[in-house]
Every structure is written in structure tokens, then in C-alpha cells.
Amino acid sequence: QLIAEQNGFISSPVHASISGTVKKIEEALTSQGTYVPAITIESDGLMTADENIVPPAVNSREDFISAVKNSGIVGLGGAGFPTYVKLDPKQNVDTLIINGAECEPYITSDSYTMISKAALISQFFELMKKYIGIKKIIIGIEKNKPDAIEVMEKLAESDPAVTVKTLPS
């Protein structure tokens, strides 16, 4: 469920990760020593999705970018950079680089996602090809993630646009 709206071009909406009740909105201290707005939600223990959430209708490049924008997808490299900005329709993008070598805590999540969600990743690649014009996909994975490498190499066997690059750990 949407809990915070985008307030500028280089920002994104925020969705609740749990179902429950908003208890407070206040400034919270981050591990970097700065204060940021934070929303505290008391979980109801049910993890139910808002019934108003429906998959977006995507029939064009603009629809696809809008769906990515409204979903709140951001990069995990520290800045939380909105993904939709990278898909700007004024730019001609033909290569997608997937960073499967992020630092902790995300490297474990990256590896798990590549192993357990290969079919969804493949669907995402097809959408990127169809709506953004991607021709080449490069997935970088650290060599100490052999299971993720194996699964992504199998995906690459069925998609000539995909290349897996093993990176030093």
C-alpha cells in the first residue's frame, strides 16, 4: 500500500512492506548519522495486500516506465536512485547491466533472487526488450555465488541476449 508519495523528479513513492497500522511519522537517525523521515507501522501479523492494488495496464514504453515509477523501485547502491529515471524515454538504451555483486546486506538477497526467481527475471528481461529496446543484458555475479551463476547461465542458454560475467569476490 502506498504510504508516501513522490515529492520530486529524483524521488519515488514508498509502499508499506507489511500490513498494519501507521503508529507514527517522525525523523529517525540513520546509521550514517543523519535524520530522515520515517514511518512506523505496527504489524497486524496478517501480511495482507491492499485489495485496491491491481497490476498496471502496460501497452507502451510510457506505460512501462510509469508502472516502474509508481511501484517505487529504486537502486540499492546507497542512494536509493529511482529506477524509472534510468528508463527515461528520451534516452536510447540498448544494454542492461545487472549488478548481482552488490555489497551486504543486498548480495545475499541478490543471490537468493537469482536462484529462486529466475522465471520472473526472464519475464523482466522480455519486458525490458519490448518496451525499452534492450538488445543486450549482462549479469555480473561474484564467483563465490556458484548457485546463482549456474541458474543465470541456464537462463542465458535460452536467451541469446543474456551474458553472465563472473566477477572477483
Please name every model-derived segment.
Residues L2-I3:
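Short hydrophobic beta-strand segments in globular cytosolic domains
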Residues I10-S169:
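Iron-sulfur-associated redox domains of electron-transfer enzymes in respiratory
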